[in-house]
UniProtKB/Swiss-Prot annotation:
<comment type="pathway">
    <text>Protein modification; protein lipoylation via endogenous pathway; protein N(6)-(lipoyl)lysine from octanoyl-[acyl-carrier-protein]: step 2/2.</text>
</comment>
<feature type="binding site">
    <location>
        <position position="67"/>
    </location>
    <ligand>
        <name>[4Fe-4S] cluster 1</name>
    </ligand>
</feature>
<keyword id="KW-0479">Metal-binding</keyword>
<feature type="binding site">
    <location>
        <position position="307"/>
    </location>
    <ligand>
        <name>[4Fe-4S] cluster 1</name>
    </ligand>
</feature>
<protein>
    <recommendedName>
        <fullName>Lipoyl synthase</fullName>
        <ecNumber>2.8.1.8</ecNumber>
    </recommendedName>
</protein>
<feature type="binding site">
    <location>
        <position position="93"/>
    </location>
    <ligand>
        <name>[4Fe-4S] cluster 2</name>
    </ligand>
</feature>
<keyword id="KW-0963">Cytoplasm</keyword>
<dbReference type="InterPro" id="IPR007197">
    <property type="entry name" value="rSAM"/>
</dbReference>
<dbReference type="InterPro" id="IPR013785">
    <property type="entry name" value="Aldolase_TIM"/>
</dbReference>
<dbReference type="Pfam" id="PF04055">
    <property type="entry name" value="Radical_SAM"/>
</dbReference>
<dbReference type="GO" id="GO:0046872">
    <property type="term" value="F:metal ion binding"/>
</dbReference>
<dbReference type="InterPro" id="IPR003698">
    <property type="entry name" value="Lipoyl_synth"/>
</dbReference>
<dbReference type="GO" id="GO:0016992">
    <property type="term" value="F:lipoate synthase activity"/>
</dbReference>
<keyword id="KW-0408">Iron</keyword>
<feature type="binding site">
    <location>
        <position position="78"/>
    </location>
    <ligand>
        <name>[4Fe-4S] cluster 1</name>
    </ligand>
</feature>
<dbReference type="InterPro" id="IPR006638">
    <property type="entry name" value="Elp3/MiaA/NifB-like_rSAM"/>
</dbReference>
<keyword id="KW-0411">Iron-sulfur</keyword>
Length: 320
């Protein structure tokens, strides 16, 4: 009998180390992968000076970006434009979703100085719009909601003109407590991603629940009817287009007015494989359907991610 696997606190488990402890049957690192179509090619910038500057600034303040931790394909574009999505509460997630490249493990306690350091970094970068997200922190009584509120408060204290979007986890089992924590320091945009369709949740989002996520979006909107709510979906995990359209209908039924829809890309051979590549024309059709359903803003395209050009989307610009 083998020795039971024991995670060490503060250690990042990624790729094979992460997915080896997930009971997912269709991860085969030796399987033949789908060939990327021509529209999935990324053009890298000629200079990395701006990218290095942002990375060094974050390292200097001990901060993290989801752009790096989740291996976002748009990192070079966004960093070159001087924008980044900050990831609070550390870089180790208590969940182990097999599509995600963020490390899994036992996280360290939250840094009480992080809200202040974050606010100062944003001030140094002279940002007008910022997106704050986090790992899942199922180890915390409020699931990290109080830390979100502290960050919003500190950011606004130093940057009174800024617009703040928060991309939150599902606050599993603590929705009411989480919303109470956010009550006095709400964001300008509240974002929570459904990620994909309910039929695939057990496989792709272990520990999550489709109805919980809808409840979170619905109850935030009931508490703050004037604040836009937003959600994002990935395609290419085994769903079909009609199932995605049904999720979009569910979002509208629960008051969500902003949508992002992008192509899933496999971070490594130890993650869930891409089941299909959706064409740009299909993304255009999704955007048209979203408008018909009443979404005020819908960013739909192969490289669209939840915080991709979030400032442009919030102002009503076309993102694809």
């Amino acid at each position: 009998m083998g020795t039971p696997f024991k995670m060490e606190r503060g250690v990042k488990y990624r790729d094979a180390a992460k997915t080896s402890i997930i009971k997912v049957t269709n991860i085969d690192p030796d399987r033949e992968l789908l060939q990327k179509p021509s529209w999935m090619k990324i053009k890298l910038p000629a200079s990395s000076a701006k990218i290095d500057s942002i990375k060094n600034g974050m390292r200097r303040h001990g901060l993290h970006s989801v752009c790096e931790e989740a291996s976002c394909p748009n990192l070079h574009e966004c960093f070159n434009h001087g924008t980044a999505t900050f990831m609070i509460l550390g870089a180790i997630c208590t969940r182990r979703c097999p599509f995600c490249d963020v490390a899994h493990g036992k996280p360290l306690p939250p840094d009480p100085e992080e809200p202040r350091k974050l606010a100062e970094t944003i001030q140094d970068m002279k940002l007008k719009y910022v997106v704050i997200t986090s790992v899942d922190r199922d180890d915390l009584p409020d699931r990290g909601a109080g830390h979100f509120a502290d960050c919003v408060r500190e950011i606004r204290a130093l940057n009174p003109e800024i617009k703040i979007e928060i991309l939150v986890p599902d606050f599993r089992g603590r929705i009411e407590l989480a919303l109470e924590k956010l009550k006095n320091n709400p964001p300008d945009v509240f974002n929570h991603n459904l990620e994909n369709i309910p039929r695939l949740y057990r496989e792709i989002r272990p520990g999550a629940d489709y109805e919980w996520s809808l409840k979170l979006l619905r109850e935030f909107k009931a508490m703050f009817p004037h604040i836009p709510t937003k959600s994002g979906l990935m395609v290419g995990l085994g769903e079909n287009n009609e199932e995605i359209l049904q999720v979009m209908r569910d979002l509208r039924t629960n008051g969500v007015t902003m949508l992002t829809l992008g192509q899933y890309l496999q971070p490594s051979r130890y993650h869930l494989p891409v089941a299909r590549y959706v064409s740009p024309e299909e993304f255009d059709e999704f955007r048209e359907k979203a408008a018909e359903m009443g979404f005020e803003h819908a960013a739909c395209g192969p490289f669209v991610r939840s915080s991709y050009h979030a400032d442009l989307q919030a102002s009503g610009g076309l993102v694809k």
